[in-house]
Amino acid sequence: MKHLIIAIITILTSSMCVMAQTRSEQIYEASDYGIVPDKGKNTSPLMDKLIKKVQKEQKAGIKSIIRLKPGRYDFHETGAAQRTYYISNHDQTNPKHVGIALEEMSNVILDGQGAQLVFHGRMLPISLVRSQDCGIQNLSIDFEHPHIAQVKVVENNPEKGILFQPAPWVDYKVVKGEFINCGEGWEMKYSFGIPFDGDTRHVMYNTGDTRCNINEVTEEKPGLIRAPHWKDDRLKAGSIIVLRSWERPAPAIFMSHDTNTCIERVKVHYAEGMGLLAQLCEDITLTGFGVCLKGVDDPRFFTTQADATHFSGCKGKIISQDGLYEGMMDDAINVHGTYLRIMKRVDNHTVIGRYMHDQSWGFEWGRKGDQVQFIRSNTMDILPDTYTITDIKPYDKETTDGAREFIITLDKEIPQRVKAEEGYGVENLSWAPEVLFARNTIRNNRARGALFSTPQPVIVEDNFFDHTSGTAILLCGDCNGWYETGACRDVTIRRNRFVNALTSQYQFTSAIISIYPEIPNLRGQEGFFHGGNGKGIVIEDNEFDTFDKPILYA
């Protein structure tokens, strides 16, 4: 009888657990809504319909899981959600066609279960906006026709120029001597490329951004194109050239105004912008995230058109761990805020500040209660006091979306020297995150490895920087060009391995680890920029396998 009672209790307890799990989760099987893999059909309209249903049916305390079956899903612009997004460090071209637009979500998980999401045209694959406690996991993002054209050097003749062969997936045409890459609703011409060694996949030594003169080309036979004016003796037969533009309309994943986001086991194989761009978000964890090739046998040599991951004006803690970042055309990670340039001193408590860079404007900069400080642009001297925003409004627009200028009122009197004609910027200290960048591999990419510009603690540990063609780690800060804040006060760089970084020269790349704020008038600087006011910058227990390049520049 005693055993029977125990058995009944066990069964009841198990049932209660199942019931509790059922009540705490609402699972949406995408296949129940017509979203099935490997059919070659346009998933965009069906996905948009499902997301609207999930958004409408959200309930407090219930986790909503959108679950896909493994396989390939094709997304086209037709039937996709259209959104106006102003995205930091991207081209502000709108509207954008969004494959999966997750907005105003709470406790929602998108679980791909190994799904391969393939996009067509010029799309923003996934957005997560104004959401909390959400996640994306177990899926990959790619495009059917990348806007980058990969070609192979077949012959390099000093007199006849270069004979090259486009990769099999490049849908090209030659019109009036111009080589044109074609996709769904777009065409692309090129004048620059990134050369890769065809055997090692490393960016070739001392090539950087190579000019590729592919004007007046002729197609000698299908798949073989002669560029008589493209002459560069560094490019041997067998070299792979990644032809790229400077456009970056959208990242693969766009995050804005989110809180507590987890992205796990997501791979981005290509995007015309960055892999992931997060702005004005709090607490982000990337685990096993990759901007990477599809494996060692992938015939592509490239991934994203710009950075792998980028965090602009975030707060809380950013964790990026166990990731793979390779083949991207810019940095693996960049963490910063944005300076506004002071355009006008309205009164002793009020200024007008402006977003200055053409790829960073149109989004929120600050809120009432935020702490700010002023900086002199040409010396990067930070004024000693901090101020609290009592009021902030867009100045040149009715709403924050699309605004370049803000009128900002502060609690204390602003120093008399802060004037437009004196060249000052203002930094928001409240939107600056702590960072952990750990156990990641960064390899075979253009430009730099990891960039940090935040006064909060930064730990960079147990990473492998393998042939980053520029600086591996950069502590920057710039109130003159990119306008990316701010000073680093507490940085630990430990137990990392660096192999042959700095094989080419790019902006701010003076050593393997480069502490390089942009200071136009260094002689006029009165104080330091990075370090101090905290732990400072500690570099310990790292391994450097290098050639005749400096390890540290400051």
Where are the model-predicted features located?
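Bacterial Sec-dependent N-terminal signal peptides
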Residues: 1-25
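Compositionally biased regions
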Residues: 15-16, 32, 65, 192
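Mature N-terminal, pre-catalytic/accessory segment of carbohydrate-active enzymes
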Residues: 20-44
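Extracellular parallel beta-helix/beta-solenoid repeat domains
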Residues: 38, 44-554
